[in-house]
């Protein structure tokens, strides 16, 4: 196991609020024949008062057919991943995104220009539930691809401090998507845990593939905003209260 993979595994294994664990288990139980892993991420990781907040999960499934059958939801999830749904458990509210194991691996890596998954999983997350050891290993391996992909896409600048590289990289990803957050949000991601990003810097840089190409951000912005619109339009049908969700996201 590489030093980066070990860092990711250790971080994903950190404990969470028992209510988050219970929610993840209940979410996995909704898809008993498909669920492989449930990851918890986002700003709520740093919160102890969860009431009134919207928690964020990724549900990783073996396949979309195993999750939904052969209907339109499986086709929509494959065509424009992920599908996003609301979830409520024991008074807590969440939204969860569904990806297959194959898509989760692919979307965390440099083979996709879209930033949405690898930008999120370059940040702290928790692997709250997994079906078995194999599912856990696959989730760790997928998440381990995210940070090198982020830094490689941003490209290095001579003399730039590691934390500034992270800040610049996140700023680039925030410019790609339709987001309601303030522009300063990209810097606050790093500033909320600078020691974490310092610790990840050298292993993540070492894991950047040889010959990795930086740049292409003008194209990413055009494609990213179009994809964001397509995902939001799809969410109007998959997400209960879809119009309210659209307004909140925009």
Describe the function of each predicted region:
Residues 1-30, 34, 39, 45-51, ...:
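Catalytic core of pol beta-like nucleotidyltransferases
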Residues 58-60:
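Short hydrophobic/aromatic beta-strand micro-patches
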């Amino acid at each position: 196991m590489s030093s980066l993979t070990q860092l990711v595994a250790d971080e994903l294994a950190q404990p969470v609020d028992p209510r988050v664990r219970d929610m993840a288990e209940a979410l996995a139980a909704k898809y008993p024949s498909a669920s492989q892993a449930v990851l918890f991420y986002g700003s709520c990781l740093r919160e102890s008062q969860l009431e009134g907040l919207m928690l964020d999960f990724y549900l990783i499934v073996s396949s979309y057919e195993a999750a939904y059958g052969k209907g339109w939801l499986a086709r929509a999830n494959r065509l424009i991943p992920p599908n996003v749904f609301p979830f409520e458990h024991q008074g807590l509210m969440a939204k969860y995104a569904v990806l297959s194991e194959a898509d989760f691996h692919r979307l965390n890596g440099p083979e996709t220009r879209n930033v949405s998954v690898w930008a999120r999983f370059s940040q702290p997350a928790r692997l709250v539930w997994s079906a078995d050891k194999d599912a856990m290993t696959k989730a760790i391996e997928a998440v381990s691809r995210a940070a090198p992909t982020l830094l490689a896409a941003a490209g290095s600048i001579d003399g730039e401090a590691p934390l500034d590289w992270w800040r610049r990289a996140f700023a680039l990803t925030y410019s790609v998507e339709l987001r309601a957050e303030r522009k300063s949000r990209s810097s606050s991601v790093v500033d909320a845990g600078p020691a974490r990003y310092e610790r990840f810097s050298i292993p993540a840089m070492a894991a950047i593939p040889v010959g990795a190409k930086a740049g292409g951000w003008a194209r990413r912005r055009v494609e990213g905003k179009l994809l964001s619109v397509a995902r939001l339009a799809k969410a109007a049908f998959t997400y209960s209260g879809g119009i309210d969700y659209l307004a909140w996201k925009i």
